[in-house]
Amino acid sequence: MAFRNWIGAFGKANALDVNSDLDRGYEAALLIQSLELEYYGDRPIRPDLELSVPKSVQATVLRKFRVAINVCRASLDQLEYQRSQLDPQELRQLQLIESVVNRYSPKRVSTAPTMTRDPDPLPRSLLGVFDKVRRQLNPAGEATLVAGFRRRRDSTLISLKVLLLLILVPLLVQQVSRTYIISPAVDRFAPDLPFLSYPKPQLEEQAVEKLRVYKAEIEFDALLRGDTIPSQEELQQQLGKKASELKEEADAESTHAVKNVLADISATIAFVVVCLFSREELRVLRGFFDEAVYGLSDSAKAFAIILFTDIFVGFHSPEGWTVLLDGIANHFGFPARENFILLFIATFPVILATIFKYWIFRYLNRVSPSSVATLRGMNGGG
């Protein structure tokens, strides 16, 4: 019984060491990728390359890189012979660590048997079978699986929580501030501050069109009832009353743009505050997204890329861009200029498509070549 307890304690400690090494290596690999993206344009870090930053900042970047790459190498050495203990999610994390280490170790010797390497006393596959049997007989195996499940569950809950905060808090702040603070304040000071209700030609044109339609409705209703058409004085009186109503509507609508801008600023401030107070949770969210993306199959990745590109740069995307630009112009109180919209549609989707192709060529082709092949096949070989 004591021997069995000793085996269980040893297996539990070994599993905890594996998780600790994997977490340290994964965090270090993500740090190296962030340094590459921020300072080296998604290229490998080179100590001999002069950056357009102060010397102290470059020294700090290189120091972080050296520490992180050493952690990745140490974690990879510890986990090299324990792959059979890892679940699919942990294997994807290990593959990320390997890709980072291999990127900075071009002469790294492959773990596969070669003619220049001393043969192992026993086949590694046989050792893996023994290790699998040992883990199945390990009394602490269930506790290890439960601990791993709880860790992934906590990561998912934290990610969903911070994602909801990033979405709901700015929206709630925007609506509440606009309804109870910004709108009353703007309505109170708009008569004294002309810039809060600056005149808009499109509002005047809309008011004139409504007044013309109202006059035609009066004459049409009189003809339908068989009455005489109102005299010029009566018509002038009714049109004057309607013009006063339209002026009040135009004055109220002229302040909507200022209210929208101030509400958007308050929502942006709320978003920044949430980000500042949720830095640790944002790191967990980033890891959650990385695992979700790496967990997709090649067909799923290709399908998502094709769907995204067809929506924004596909054949029917101009209609969507037109609706989007009209909505933005109306939100900020600007007239929807047809020439600007046509120029935007003729240039921006082309730039966006070029960025997609460059990203596929530089990043996706290196990280997941099979996804690129699947993408070409699903996209008709293009």
UniProtKB/Swiss-Prot annotation:
Gene Ontology CC entries for this record: plasma membrane
Highest rank taxon of the organism: Bacteria
Transmembrane segments: 156-176, 257-277, 305-325, 340-360
Protein's membrane topology: Multi-pass membrane protein
Any Pfam family matching the protein: CemA
Role noted for this protein: Required for H(+) efflux immediately after light irradiation to form a rapid H(+) concentration gradient across the thylakoid membranes. Together with PxcL, contributes to transient H(+) uptake following dark to light transition.
Protein's name according to its UniProt entry: Proton extrusion protein PxcA
UniProt source species: Synechococcus sp. (strain CC9311)
